[in-house]
Regions:
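Short hydrophobic beta-strand that contains or immediately precedes a catalytic carboxylate
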Residues: 43
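Short Cys/His-centered divalent metal-binding micro-motifs
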Residues: 38, 61-87
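Alpha-helical and His/Cys-centered functional microenvironments
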Residues: 6, 48-49, 74, 81
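Pocket-edge structural micro-motifs
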Residues: 35, 50, 66
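Short, surface-exposed beta-edge/turn micro-motifs
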Residues: 28-29, 60-62
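A boundary/linker detector
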Residues: 1-40, 85-114
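Short linker/helix segments within small regulatory modules
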Residues: 47-61
Length: 114
């Protein structure tokens, strides 16, 4: 028996791994921040911890090069300002794509990054 396909609020399919297509990029071969493609890329959920699954379903994730933009000192896990900038950008895009107000975003993701 086949599993029923799940879809997010935009009608985009959610894969078996829990991810919908990113709404931030359609280029999964290059780092979202630096544009390089010659390095290992990680899938980074913009809003982690309690909001990780929502980020996956809503398409709020980006590919990042592992050593520099994801885990490095200047990356989102080593640089709080870089992480805030990415969260702000993702919030703006989510509000535009889903038609959410700032309050609706806050209700879904716990706070506003604007």
């Amino acid at each position: 028996m086949q599993k029923a396909m799940k879809y997010n609020a935009l009608g985009k399919p959610i894969g078996e791994n829990g991810y919908a297509d990113s709404i931030l990029t359609d280029d999964y071969e290059h780092c979202f921040l630096c544009g390089r493609c010659d390095r290992k890329l990680d899938r980074h959920e913009v809003y982690g911890n309690a909001y990780r699954n929502k980020s996956k379903v809503d398409g709020l994730w980006v590919p990042l090069c592992h050593d520099t933009c994801h885990e490095g000192r200047s990356g989102v896990h080593g640089n709080a300002q870089k992480a805030r900038e990415l969260r702000r950008l993702a919030q703006i895009e989510a509000m535009n794509v889903f038609g959410w107000t700032e309050e609706q975003f806050r209700m879904r993701y716990g706070k506003s990054y604007l």
